[in-house]
Regions:
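Conserved phosphate- and dinucleotide-binding cores of soluble alpha/beta proteins
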Residues: 1-112
């Protein structure tokens, strides 16, 4: 993504270990029910995974269209995600699956 301001590569892995956060908010490129969230770029996904190791909770923020797309690399397994924030277009089966895995699904109410 040309316009994103993201640092990737070996320096991220080294730097990420120096930080600790309660919550890591991440975007995603896709979703596979049997695996979890997927990314479209290996280097960015590696950067997110490195940062997640220093976080208490991983929170995925994404629009519902990503639940019908698939990235090329595993970003986060379901067991690694604490909560998901998305819009009310999330497929019912995806929402149910996430909740069954103990993942909190947050969807804004209409009109808010």
């Amino acid at each position: 993504q040309k316009e994103s301001q993201v640092m990737v590569g070996p320096l991220v892995r080294q730097c990420a270990g120096e930080f600790f956060v309660d919550k890591l908010f991440v975007g995603t490129d896709g979703f596979l029910p049997e695996i979890g969230f997927t990314g479209g770029d290996m280097m960015r996904t590696e950067a997110m995974k490195s940062m997640a190791q220093s976080a208490k909770k991983v929170i995925v923020v994404t629009d519902s269209s990503k639940f019908s797309r698939q990235g090329v690399v595993v970003q986060f397994k379901l067991s690694e995600v604490h909560s998901v924030y998305t819009d009310n277009g999330i497929p019912n089966e995806s929402k149910k699956l996430l909740e069954e895995q103990g993942i909190r699904v947050c969807v804004p109410e209409e009109g808010n």
